[in-house]
Amino acid sequence: MQTYGNPDVTYGWWAGNAGVTNKSGKFIAAHIAHTGLIAFAAGGSTLWELARYNPEIPMGHQSSIFLAHLASIGIGFDEAGAWTGAGVASIAIVHLVLSMVYGAGGLLHSVLFVGDMQDSEVPQARKFKLEWDNPDNQTFILGHHLLFFGVACIWFVEWARIHGIYDPAIGAVRQVEYNLNLTSIWNHQFDFLAIDSLEDVLGGHAFLAFLEITGGAFHIATKQVGEYTKFKGAGLLSAEAILSFSCAGLGWMAVVAAFWCAQNTTVYPEAWYGEALILKFGIAPYWIDSVDLSGGPAFFGHTTRAALANVHYYFGFFFLQGHLWHALRAMGFDFKRILKEPLPAQLYE
């Protein structure tokens, strides 16, 4: 992270991963522990939503975010095709068990394994050391991330093809064969809010899987061509810069997801998320429900869709602010100077 020339900078507990910036082993431990927290939250929240679920009320009116996602991918239905929550408790418990495994893994990497991967006795592990200003090191690690994303897309495509996912057009779970029409995939990047074909949705994921796995293999296998010049980022590439890139990506995805969730009822079926939302403008854009739920069990009187869309949008907005903050710091701007140095005299005139 940006230290402004101070070699002895220290970080408080609230600084998160900043304290393990140059300790790749501890960095991996933090990643594993974070995965455990996510698994615990998913498992615990799913059990809580299942315990309070009322089959007499539409799921989208009960603020059941985790149940809605499971129902969308065809989980929880009985043999007659009705959603009963079958198997959902088992999935939640598996997540809770995995959270303990991930937690133990985080402790193992944090306490017993080397703090920096470059000190490891395993040659393959040493390849995952962190050299923030080394593009060959960063592209190698990026390639592995892309491979995981690509495999996840394949899992989703194959799950939909073999098991099936919920299709709101027929109100039932069905098997979906992906449509790998490149023209259709290209065009949907401009009208994805209105996409109404699960085949096209799965085709997009299949195409993404190809791009990400190909890109991952490319990044792992290749090194930078030519000299690492200032034009290519020499002197700029750093932990702070890469954090800013990550914040930008998360922010952009969150904003896109917010608009998609608010309007699209194919990927986000009304049966599970509630009715489509109405876009409003105040200090910032926001969405409101198109139905009145003030007397229902939903939190704050809103549908699951309203909660997802608005939370995604505002988190995305703040992630984009985080991107600007960290990008400026990576470029050398010291925000503390604003408080330390007096303003120009002409500002007081």
Swiss-Prot record:
Species the sequence originates in: Prochlorococcus marinus (strain NATL2A)
GO aspect biological process, one term: photosynthetic electron transport chain
Protein name: Divinyl chlorophyll a/b light-harvesting protein PcbE
Membrane topology per record: Multi-pass membrane protein
Family: Belongs to the PsbB/PsbC family. IsiA/Pcb subfamily.
Protein task: The antenna complex functions as a light receptor, it captures and delivers excitation energy to photosystems II and I. The Prochlorales pcb genes are not related to higher plant LHCs.
Cofactor(s) for this UniProt protein: divinyl chlorophyll a; divinyl chlorophyll b
GO molecular function, one term: chlorophyll binding
Pfam families: PSII
Database matches in InterPro entries: PS_antenna-like, PS_II_antenna-like_sf
Localization, UniProt: Cellular thylakoid membrane
Disulfide-bonded cysteines: none
Residues that span the membrane, as ranges: 27-47, 65-85, 88-108, 201-221, 241-261, 308-328
Superkingdom: Bacteria
GO cellular component term of the entry, any: plasma membrane-derived thylakoid membrane
